[in-house]
Design a protein with these regions (language model features):
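C-terminal motif of bacterial Sec signal peptides marking the signal peptidase cleavage site
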Residues: 12-15
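Bacterial signal peptide processing site
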Residues: 17-20
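Extracytoplasmic "Venus flytrap"
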Residues: 27-48, 52-55, 61-72, 92-94, ...
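An alpha-beta-alpha
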Residues: 49, 135-175, 179, 271-289
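Periplasmic-binding protein-like
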Residues: 84-91, 111, 201-212, 231
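Flexible loop/hinge segments that line or gate small-molecule binding clefts
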Residues: 103-127, 232-244
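Hydrophobic alpha-helical segments within soluble ligand-binding/sensing domains
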Residues: 125-147, 248-264
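Hinge/cleft segment of the Venus flytrap/periplasmic-binding protein
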Residues: 264-319
Length: 319
């Protein structure tokens, strides 16, 4: 079990007040199921923690490899000894255990992702992924030569999946979208098997909607001369001629936003959703293979969505 005190590694920060008042953050902690060095989801959480350290002048801690309830319980106990009162569990796997232990740590607020927060000191965060998927689908459909697009998602509940399908069909009525699932965010081997099946069916643009395998998928698409839509991070650096654009979830910015709400005494319990309008979702850099006219059109569509809440088809994302 790894337990890191970032203020010792990076910068010794003073000025932390003694005691714990409602709405006042003493120190912050982060739990990640894998590592902060994955370059995608875990790294985003780590960057958010560093942002909190800088913005709010607090000590921050993180633990990696937090995959089971026993390790999570121990980590929260350890955090409490360090006067941590705002804890981020960087994934849906933390929602249930946070609900269970919340009553034992009433002076802490426990924040997770994509779950159901039921206690007064728990909150679950969700990125509203439909719109980003819609814009990703539009972009993919504008560049396909075979009219066959593919999605390799982790789970069927991901709203970006249906968003991608609807966006692709809005842009190109001839487009067919084939969807497959891995059943886990990190099953790279399974995802690559799914990719082989899609490529055998003449799919020429793929949306790997899973942060644990998207890099592997994009690398293989690059080798085969196909296109990708990046996921979670702006993945244009993996190949600007391969990655048409990316659907970017700024977990780092969201963590700073949540820390600000907590400090102001405005962080609500329960389940909260966030979208483009909150500044925590965006589209990544567009590939140079995409015509300037289409880029301009997409930027106008995105701005209109931020301003009005309506997508290019005139509809709002489904609830």
């Amino acid at each position: 079990m790894k337990f890191f005190h970032l203020s010792m590694i990076l910068l010794l920060i003073g000025g932390c007040s003694a005691g714990n008042r409602s709405g006042e953050m003493d120190n912050a902690g982060l739990l990640v199921p894998e590592t902060i060095d994955d370059g995608v989801w875990g790294t985003k959480g780590y960057q958010g923690l560093l942002g909190i350290q800088k913005e709010f002048d607090v000590k921050v801690y993180y633990k990696e490899g937090m995959k089971n309830d026993a390790s999570v319980r121990q980590a929260i106990d350890d955090f409490e000894k360090e006067d941590v009162n705002l804890v981020f569990g960087h994934g849906s796997e933390y929602s249930s255990i946070f609900n269970e232990v919340a009553s034992e740590h009433k002076d802490m607020h426990l924040v997770s992702f994509n779950g159901d927060a039921t206690q007064k000191n728990t909150t679950s965060l969700t990125f509203k992924g439909y719109a980003m998927g819609f814009f990703g689908g539009m972009t993919a459909a504008s560049q396909t030569k075979t009219d066959r697009l593919g999605i390799i998602a982790a789970f069927s509940w991901q709203p970006e999946v249906q968003g991608f399908i609807d966006g692709a069909r809005y842009q190109n009525s001839e487009a067919e979208v084939l969807v497959d699932y891995t059943g886990h965010w990190d099953h790279a081997e399974v995802a690559l098997e799914r990719l082989d099946g899609l490529l055998d069916q003449d799919v020429d643009v793929v949306y790997p909607a899973g942060d644990g395998y998207n890099v592997a998928i994009i690398e293989k698409l690059k080798e085969s001369g196909r296109y990708a839509i990046g996921y979670v991070s702006d993945q244009s650096d993996l190949g600007e001629s391969t990655v048409l654009t990316s659907t970017v979830q700024h977990a780092d910015k969201l963590y700073e936003l949540i820390a600000g709400k907590y400090t102001a005494g405005e962080l609500e319990s329960g389940n909260l959703e966030f979208d483009f309008q909150d500044g925590v979702i965006s589209m990544g850099e567009f590939s140079p293979v995409i015509p300037d006219g289409f880029k301009s059109e997409m930027n106008q569509h995105i701005k209109a969505y931020v301003d009005t809440g309506k997508l290019p088809n005139g509809k709002e994302p489904p609830l």
